[in-house]
Amino acid sequence: KRLYAELREGDIIADLAAHEQHWPLIVAADVLCYFGALGDLLARVHQRLEPGGWFVFSVEKILPDHDGVVPGNGNWALQRQGRYVHAEHYVYDAVCTAGFRVLRIDRPVVRQEAGADVPGLLLVAERIRHDG
C-alpha cells in the first residue's frame, strides 16, 4: 500500500543514536509500552527532531488496583503481559524534561485485551529546546 516513506526495524534508541538525519515528525504508536523509564528514548527522539518538530506517541495508562494502590514505582510498571504502563504525570514530566512542549493529550482506549478496554494516552509533543 506504500503507507510509509521509510520503515526502520531494530533497537529504537541505538538506531536514533546511529543516524544524523533530522525529521519534522516522528510517530511511535504502540512502541513506548515496551519501555519502563522513558528518559533515554525521549532524549534520542529530541536529538533527531528538527526544531519545532513533533513527536506523536501512545502509552498504556497505569491504573490503581482494586485497593487503590498504584503498581510499580508510581511512574511506570511492568504488567504480566510484558508491556509497561505509565502514569500520566510521569509521561508529561518526562516529555517536558526532555525539551518538548505537550501540545495535546488524549485518553483513548489503545487496545482490547481479554475482552477489556486498555486505557491509554496519546500525546503530541513539540521540540522546543535545542540540544547542547
Where are the predicted features?
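Core SAM-dependent methyltransferase catalytic element
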Residues: V109-G132
